[in-house]
Amino acid sequence: NYINGYDKDSNTIYELKTTIDKSGYPMDIDISNDGQKLVTSYMKIQGTKVQSVIAMYNFSSVGQNENADRMMGSYTVDDALYPIVKFTDNDNIACFGNNDIRTYTMTEKPEERAVIDLRSREMQGVFYNSSCVGYIAVSDSASKAKYKIYIYDNKGALKAEVDYDNAFDKIYATEEEIIVTGDMDCSIIRFNGSMKFNYSFTKNLVNVVPDSNEEEYVVIFENETQTIALKGM
């Protein structure tokens, strides 16, 4: 496998070669917004055991001075898979796995910030921004709601738990809020867990995204779009 990076003029910035024997099978990859850093997730099979290797690279002058392949650090986790790794901003990383969520800070070299135990819950969707991470999971038998949304800061502290009983298909976070859609339902949730907006439209939703104007949102249906404004929110 090769990982190639290019500038806006299609010139090669870097080329990394990985092998299944050494690195494992690629699961996910992400690059920081400034294009200077890279995170990768690989799955390795060691006999009958599975390992995940999360590796971080820095292609700025810092990484150039460190070593030839620009790797600044890596973390090996036994009995785990991390199919989603994301830069939440230029200096922070969230890795979503089958057993936990791991967050890292990487101003220059990576440092682990938090390990958030999923407590055997299966994530149905994940979200993140520069200050928080979270996920939605099927509620346990003690809850009347279909789903529960868990919101953490990037140091791993639980900020809120939200019961969610609408249809669910997509969840994501902006810097201001969490947006959840499914079928004809849409909810906008604040990071403290309070509900900002909850509505069922008359047509199936494709997506809901914030507009450039504050408190306005573009609602995307299969055959049209509408702009809605929230008042008194």
What are these regions (language model features)?
Residues 1, 22-31, 74-88, 118-131, ...:
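Repeated scaffold domains used in trafficking and secretory/extracellular systems
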Residues 1, 12-20, 65-76, 110-117, ...:
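A short beta-strand motif characteristic of beta-propeller blades
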Residues 2-5, 46-57, 99-105, 142-150, ...:
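Structural motif
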Residues 2-82:
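Non-cytosolic head/periplasmic domains of membrane-anchored proteins
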Residues 7-11, 59-62, 106-109, 152-155, ...:
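Short loop/turn segments that connect beta-strands within beta-propeller blades
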Residues 35-38, 92-94, 132-134, 178, ...:
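Hydrophobic beta-strand positions that form the internal "hydrophobic ladder"
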Residues 116-207:
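Intrinsically disordered, low-complexity segments enriched in Gly and acidic/Ser/Thr residues
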Residues 205-233:
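Blade-level signature of beta-propeller repeat domains, shared across WD40, Kelch, NHL, RCC1
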